[in-house]
Amino acid sequence: MGSDFYLRYYVGHKGKFGHEFLEFEFRPDGKLRYANNSNYKNDVMIRKEAYVHKSVMEELKRIIDDSEVTKEDDALWPPPDRVGRQELEIVIGDEHISFTTSKIGSLIDVNQSKDPEGLRVFYYLVQDLKCLVFSLIGLHFKIKPI
């Protein structure tokens, strides 16, 4: 699968229920690591690990390439605050990018930022990545073998 690809995403905050977060990463060898921590109603941390096929890794690269997020800069994005923070780190080929911003509640937050075009690219990419990861985790851990 090559060592030219890595992705990590984190979103979280520290509040009345402690440190609540969602984090996932795809490693160069195809390992998907997922963690979801919510202390709401004494919930426990969910940790899952699975290996994904190289075709999934290729699709992930395609999604990132199509988004053109590697052309963006987070300098004008809202900084992390008491509401929370998001981090996205991607290594793809020779490029290594890292973004940090506050939690984004909706497109209204995006449109009111100092860089709505760039933040919109980030926002939609994160939505796509979360959807893919939730689907992979759900399918991998809920399917019953025959």
From Swiss-Prot:
Any one GO molecular function term: RNA binding
CDD domains listed in its UniProt record: Mago_nashi
Superkingdom: Eukaryota
GO biological process, one term: RNA splicing
Entry keyword set: Cytoplasm, mRNA processing, mRNA splicing, mRNA transport, Nucleus, RNA-binding, Transport
Compartments where found: Nucleus; Nucleus speckle; Cytoplasm
GO cellular component: catalytic step 2 spliceosome; cytoplasm; exon-exon junction complex; nuclear speck
UniProt record similarity statement: Belongs to the mago nashi family.
Assembly description: Part of the EJC core complex that contains casc3, eif4a3, magoh and rbm8a.
Protein function: Core component of the splicing-dependent multiprotein exon junction complex (EJC) deposited at splice junctions on mRNAs. The EJC is a dynamic structure consisting of core proteins and several peripheral nuclear and cytoplasmic associated factors that join the complex only transiently either during EJC assembly or during subsequent mRNA metabolism.
Protein name: Protein mago nashi homolog
Origin species: Xenopus laevis (African clawed frog)
